Design a protein with these regions (language model features):
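Bacterial N-terminal signal peptides that target proteins for export
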Residues: 2-14
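C-terminal motif of bacterial Sec signal peptides marking the signal peptidase cleavage site
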Residues: 20-22
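Bacterial signal peptide processing site
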Residues: 24-26
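Long, solvent-exposed N-terminal ectodomains/accessory regions
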Residues: 31-112
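Non-catalytic propeptide/linker segments at domain boundaries
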Residues: 106-262
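Extracytoplasmic/secreted cell-surface and envelope-processing proteins
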Residues: 219-223, 290-291, 317-325, 347-351, ...
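Catalytic-core segments of thiol-dependent peptidases
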Residues: 254-345
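Active-site-proximal C-terminal subdomain of hydrolase catalytic domains
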Residues: 337-437
Length: 437
């Protein structure tokens, strides 16, 4: 995700600086995914192609190579869903120098952020060899001309993220890369006009929200884009709850105007005019991947009854997204929406939570009946994060005039290319009775 701090350095330069933190390598294996897809900025496509990769290590070389699709597709305002890629016809052979050559057939789902210009085919230009030494050499040779123009501190651990092989001036020798021409088609999993399950959100008469904000820099105490985003969201809560018709309670009883690290756990709760209740808890952490046990315990208290869980901060190139998916406690039949608001989170979300929810709910074998994931196909600014979380909260509060996901997403910075998965089995339509009215 990007920061608007120090605008003098330029918007794209900060994107590079922010997204470079916390690189993660390959996506986790999973047998369950969140299913279909809806967005007001992107269309879901399937890219089918034959690939080839060489490596001196047997440890997931295909995964390592496909990571470079993140960078290339980001250059097209798009990104692929790595954990659900379908691989067939995988064949291994030895090269003359003792390395392993793997040929494979792949079908990659892509959130394509240019819905008005859908190509019939697309050429991936991926590194041929992904061994450690080969990636280091590839990075050293091409970390200036073949990366996003704002990238910096590029190394073999982040080259795949900034990789832009279609740049003017990017000269890649045929021996260095594999050019795979993908056939492109629309995915049958694209949906439109799907609503959140308002009848499930409000069946107990309460909307409970957890909004987590990660710092831009671990250990920061001030002058930090993540802390500023947290403070801005707290100010939004103060303003919105001041309009509540019922009594407003806060924890702590007195919340500073800029709570920051002095009050990293705040809650607003109020009764609405028709008897419904809204409760929003905002939390500030360094980063999810290294969060202390105190955060885990607090999250376990809040998560079972939460209707919306929004994480705003570094994706850590997938690390923080997957770390949050492994935390919390869940309740049978509890419908929940997760908003993973960080860099390219569509690429990094795996099936961990879907699998957990499927095991918890016998009537939900796919793990999507009681859960949706809202993710980004592109990065997001820290300064956009408070408004993005508020947009979804406001959408859920709009039960008198229900909003589709596409309508809700109009309140979010379009640069993020936000989308939802898991909504394909939603049944809510306007006019359906809610819980406590």
């Amino acid at each position: 995700m990007r920061s608007n701090a120090l605008l003098i350095q330029g918007r794209n330069l900060l994107l590079a600086a922010t997204c470079a933190v916390g690189c993660a390598s390959s996506a986790a294996d999973t047998d369950v995914d969140e299913g279909a897809f809806s967005s007001n900025e992107a269309v879901l496509l399937e890219f089918e192609f034959d690939g080839e990769v060489v490596s001196d290590s047997p440890w997931k070389p295909i995964d390592d190579q496909l990571l470079y699709t993140v960078g290339q597709l980001n250059g097209e305002r798009s990104v692929g869903r790595l954990d659900t890629v379908k691989l067939t016809n995988v064949e291994q052979s030895a090269t003359q120098n003792g390395e392993t050559r793997i040929r494979y057939h792949a079908v990659l789902q892509v959130a394509w952020g240019n819905p008005r210009t859908i190509p019939a085919s697309y050429t991936f230009v991926l590194p041929r060899s992904v061994g450690y030494a080969a990636q280091r050499s590839f990075t050293e040779q091409h970390k200036h001309e073949c990366v996003d123009w704002g990238a910096h501190d590029v190394d073999e651990g982040s080259m795949w993220y900034y990789y832009r092989p279609l740049n003017d001036g990017c000269a890649l020798a045929d021996a260095e890369v594999v050019k795979s021409v993908a056939t492109v088609r629309r995915s049958s999993e694209q949906t439109t006009d799907k609503y959140p399950e308002y009848q499930k959100i409000w069946e107990d008469g309460r909307l409970e929200v957890i909004a987590i904000f990660g710092k831009y820099k671990d250990g920061a105490t001030s002058n930090d884009a993540g802390i500023s985003a947290y403070n801005e969201f707290a100010d939004m809560l103060r303003t919105e709850f001041a309009r509540a018709k019922g009594t407003v309670t806060t924890t702590p009883a007195s919340i500073p105007r800029a709570p920051g690290i002095g009050a990293p756990d705040i809650t607003y709760e109020a009764a609405l005019g028709d008897g419904k209740v809204i409760k929003v808890t905002a939390l500030l952490v360094d980063n999810i991947g290294a969060a202390p046990e105190s955060f885990d315990r607090r999250y376990e208290v809040l998560s079972p009854t939460a209707d919306l869980i929004a994480y705003n901060g570094h994706a850590g190139l997938g690390q923080n997204v997957r770390a949050l998916a492994q935390k919390g406690r869940w309740k049978t039949g509890q419908y929940q929406v997760f908003f993973m608001n960080g860099c390219d989170t569509f690429a990094y979300v795996d099936g961990t939570l879907a699998g957990t929810r499927a095991a918890l709910n016998p009537d939900d074998p796919t793990g999507t009946k009681y859960m949706e994931f809202v993710t980004n196909a592109m990065p997001s600014f820290f300064t956009s994060m408070p408004e993005a979380s508020r947009a979804i909260v406001k959408g859920f509060l709009s039960y008198e005039q229900p909003m589709t996901y596409e309508q809700i997403f109009k309140g979010i910075d379009r640069a993020e290319v936000v989308l939802v998965t898991g909504e394909e089995d939603n049944v809510y339509r306007p006019g359906m009775p809610l819980g406590n009215r």
